[in-house]
Amino acid sequence: MRRAAVVAAVGALVAGFAVYGSAQAQEDPARDASGATAASLREAAAASGTFVGTAINDGLLSNPTYANIAASEFSSVTAENAMKWDTTEPSRGNFNFSGGDRLVDFANRNLHQVYGHTLVWHSQLPGWVQNGGFNAEQLNQVMVDHIDAVAGHFSGELAYWDVVNEVFNDDGSMRQSVFQTTIGTEYIANAFRAADAADPWANLCINDYNVEGINAKSDALYDLVSSLLDQGVPIDCVGLQSHLILGQVPGDLQENMQRFADLGLEVIITELDIRMDLPADSGKLAQQAEDYAEVVTACMNVPACEGITVWGISDRDSWVPGVFPGQGAACVWDESYQPKPAYDGMLTAFGG
Ligand code: G3I
């Protein structure tokens, strides 16, 4: 809860700044006909005390349409790739913060909070770490040094950090990352302690996918965070990535969020997108609008759910088609940056 007051203050500012209302949203006849009163997702979300964010590819901020939607519709931005290890420390001790700094600058100019993603992850991990042949003590030092430099660089600028990302297999066993196999599970507690020392301001999260419903993996996550809390490890939040499939929002999403909230943690929907088999059609898009609304409603029903980040603005920029051939249309804006029915679904569910 360390940054809660700051985030709330930003939310209040956001709600009061008509200039940040989206011209695009106001011109949308469908939205006018719906009777929605909020001019943007960020206004609607702020009015209900939550943030609404998007992942940003900072290379696309030079596209005015992209930048305008990012600025006007969202109150939080996450670096899609720019704060990951392969970008920030491509070789040992050589740091590159240019993309992250651009994002922080964009966020400060548009009254966004910044969500840091991610300090320790098995993917987008440079070869010098993955294949460095370090022993446990050495790798732990490499990890702590990385956290110290990266979280230290951005200290005071970020509302959240995903300290560790995707530490589990889907069956709830520990993913056999180089950190797990070399250091053991204690690398997770070590990472949180290092992040807390480097940035005492950010809320510190553990983030994963396929943990939205109650299942073996979310049970393992629950057990792990319970144990971290028992050990006094500085953990503040759980991120449910929420890369979902059309028509398959887990019915127990709210119940699952609530059990983490009951541990005293914040819960964040960190990477929401809802993919479908292509081509999209009006029936699928209507279902997608219901699905997005269902996720927002579940978050709104859990006071500890502080916000929702969608993973990218438009279908044009989404990671989905590259990884799931034949699937896509997962975002809230289409390939031409026009809002889809999912936009109204989210807006209405936020109370707009
Ligand atoms: O930067 C290189 C560029 O130099 C090279 O020319 C180009 C050629 O393919 O690749 C570029 O790197 C790509 C990188 O995105 C930056 O654009 C990688 O190939 C590509 O694999 C990478 O994809 C990212 C993916 O994480 C990597 O796992 C996606 O953009 C990003 O949306 C995705 O995000 C993850 C979250 O971090 C964690 N949760 C799952 C989520 C979706 O996979």
Positions of predicted regions on the chain:
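Acidic-and-aromatic substrate-binding clefts and catalytic sites of carbohydrate-active enzymes
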Residues: 55-67, 85-98, 168-173, 211-220, ...
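Substrate-binding cleft and catalytic face of glycoside hydrolase catalytic domains
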Residues: 72-90, 98-211
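Aromatic-lined carbohydrate-recognition surfaces of secreted/lumenal glycan-active proteins
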Residues: 52-57, 162-163, 189-218, 268-271, ...
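Boundary/entry segment of secreted carbohydrate-active catalytic domains
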Residues: 31-80
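Short, acidic/polar
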Residues: 57-73, 140-150, 216-228, 253, ...
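Aromatic- and acid-rich polysaccharide-binding/catalytic face
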Residues: 74-81, 165, 198-208, 221-248, ...
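Active-site clefts of carbohydrate-active enzymes
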Residues: 118, 203-211, 242-243, 260-292, ...
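Secretory targeting and sorting signals
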Residues: 1-26
